[in-house]
Amino acid sequence: MHFDDRFVLPKSLSGLRINGQRLLKRIATLGEIGPIQGKNGEPGSARLALTDEDREARELVTAWMRELGLAVRIDAIGNVLGVRAAADGSTANPVMTGSHIDTVRTGGLYDGNLGVLAGLEIIETLDTARITTRRPMAVAFFTNEEGARFNPDMMGSLVYCGGMSAEEAYNVVGIDGARVGDELARIGYLGTTPCPGEAPHAFVELHIEQGPVLEAEGIRFGAVTGVQGISWQELTISGESNHAGTTPMSLRHDAGYTAARIATFVRELALEMGQPHVGTVGQITLHPNLVNVVAATAVMTVDLRNTDEAILTESERRFSAFVAELAASEGVTIASRVLARFEPVAFDERVIGLVEHTIARLGNSGKRMPSGAGHDAQMLARMCPTAMIFTQSHKGISHNPAEFTEPADLVMGADLLLQVMLSLSETDIAISAEPPAVAILTTTHAHGSDVAVTHTAGIPDGGSSDGDDDDDVPDEQIAA
């Protein structure tokens, strides 16, 4: 474990703990906005980014920020930042925490919400104890982390750190035809604070794991070392519609069969490449989608992830080669476009070590682990030292009202975050050195007119697919 003992806090701060009941009450209250129920009656939320439900949640959380005396800023992409002043009015860069409050259509109560509301609870805990910190403390929630309505996901934090301009983001068109810029204005969150935003002294995000590893291994918390690289593609397969009964198998150009072959290859490739590589086909739409008609077109998404950039790139190469060969053998055309492409992100070893040390100091089991999901923290790592804390997720379930983390773990997670933020704020260690570069290779938008076809299999150079995928737009992009 890499731990600098200059992070050690005095006893007056090392014993400080949050008010658990207050945190849990805020989580439940926020969860009542956009309410849905799981199949067994579990409470969940549906708050797609920049919808009326998102606006209501923003108003609630922003009101809580103001009640706590935070200086609230809304930036050009609708990110909201609440800042607590330092002891001497210092204008030093703040120690920041935060996450997101938008959800997928089938959201639970904790994804994102925990990180934001734990930050507010930390502010209230400091206020109640009449403790002022050497550096400002900041709590943020970022716009459109999920990518469920607008692509790319993590849009707000991407714009905040300069990986995408606000003007480019404004022109993204969502699954319902709405523009990001128009919707920001409509809900009243087209802010004036410029982007890119201020670089924090450090950023730490508390989040549920959204996976089964911690629970399966009987470990309470994770010290997150980084985030897997992500490669998202959308494929449009154009074959030939024909009669299901009269067309011999040897004479078919079946888009549905081709999609099935691709889905099988994605799984086989992941198994062959081994852990931690994963591959997923999350969406398939067939046209005309009739029981007695060979499918003319298929639109599908492919999600490849790995913690090693070289391996991820190799998986993309092998996938592209397979798709080209398959298109030729089946007599179909396959057009692909990139939805998002992020390199793996390594978090700051000093902050990871601090998280590990704090987990152990407060009497908990912990482990170093990468994140399989994308998070706002990976964007903030572009501009400051960053790490994350993971709590257990029961059965690994997330993006589902059945998402559950033990209340005691939610509370302890917030205590860990409090102690880590205090250590970062109160020490003189020069932690704000330039972080390692984090390349965002490609981000294109799944539903806007600016999406470029990046590869076409089975079509001569200069050709184009005759598939009309406008009718096959997925209902909801997979959230990171």
Language-model segments: which ranges?
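Zn-dependent metallopeptidase/amidohydrolase metal-coordination segment
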Residues: L23-R26, I33-I36, G98-S99, G366-L416, ...
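His/Asp/Glu-rich mid-to-C-terminal helical/loop segments that flank catalytic regions of hydrolases
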Residues: D5, E56, T225, H243, ...
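Acidic/His- and Gly-rich active-site-bordering loop/insert found
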Residues: F7-P10, R17-G108
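Active-site-adjacent substrate-binding region
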Residues: R17-G20, E32, I36, G177-T225, ...
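A short beta-alpha structural unit
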Residues: S45-L50, G282-N289, T301, T307, ...
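Midchain, well-structured core segments that form catalytic/ion-binding scaffolds
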Residues: P10, N144-E145, R149-A310
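Active-site metal-coordination/substrate-binding segment of hydrolases
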Residues: T62-R66, A71, D75, N79-G181, ...
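Alpha-helical metal-binding/catalytic segments enriched in His/Glu/Asp
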Residues: T97, T106-E146, S231-I237, H243-L269, ...
